């Protein structure tokens, strides 16, 4: 049976220059061939588990035993975890096998609108991220994009990103199929 690692190796052999993997980290992490593993960590133990179920300890154990240091935490900031940004930054800095942390704001899909942040809350989170950058935390986002993310004043969709999810190919991501969602996009990479 083929593994995710087999697919990463095959993509490299096909000529893809960069092969990144996005994961929730609940399975052992053995992907040294991946350029970057974007691993969802949505806060400290309490907040992460409130967002993603009781997975925090499993994820941290899997990171400890990962076969490479190509992991980047990937946090979607929302109403539940907005006060844990500093914690995730410091955890990224202090955890073996973690190279950096990357952020997004929650994109308010119809069934999760209550999790979205106000403009003021986004600005506050960006100030915390900037402080962490100044402390030397390896943040994988561009500070110059923060004003656009706070105001939602960047062009969407991102035509450079193509996502295959459950057999459906989308420009930018699955949010493109939800009416009026692109204008509320929280993906930092789109503005960057």
Where are these regions (language model features)?
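Radical SAM enzyme [4Fe-4S]-AdoMet core and its adjacent flexible, acidic
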Residues: 5-6, 14, 33-36, 40-166, ...
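Membrane-interface junctions of multi-pass transporters
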Residues: 168, 172-192
């Amino acid at each position: 049976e083929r593994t995710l690692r087999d697919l990463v190796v095959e993509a490299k052999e096909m000529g893809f220059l960069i092969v990144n993997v996005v994961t929730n980290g609940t399975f052992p992490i053995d992907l040294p061939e991946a350029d970057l593993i974007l691993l969802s960590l949505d806060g400290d133990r309490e907040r992460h588990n409130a967002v993603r179920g009781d997975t925090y300890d499993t994820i941290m154990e899997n990171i400890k035993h990962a076969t490479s240091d190509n992991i980047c935490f990937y946090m979607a900031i929302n109403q539940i975890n907005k006060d844990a940004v500093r914690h995730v930054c410091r955890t990224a800095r202090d955890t073996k096998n973690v190279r950096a942390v990357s952020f997004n704001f929650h994109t308010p899909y119809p069934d999760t609108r209550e999790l979205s942040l106000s403009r003021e809350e986004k600005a506050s989170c960006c100030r915390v991220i900037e402080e962490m950058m100044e402390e030397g935390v390896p943040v994988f986002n561009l500070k110059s994009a923060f004003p656009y993310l706070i105001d939602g004043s960047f062009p969407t969709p991102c035509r450079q990103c193509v996502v295959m999810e459950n057999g459906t190919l989308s420009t930018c991501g699955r949010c493109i199929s939800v009416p009026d969602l692109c204008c509320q996009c929280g993906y930092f990479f789109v503005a960057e």
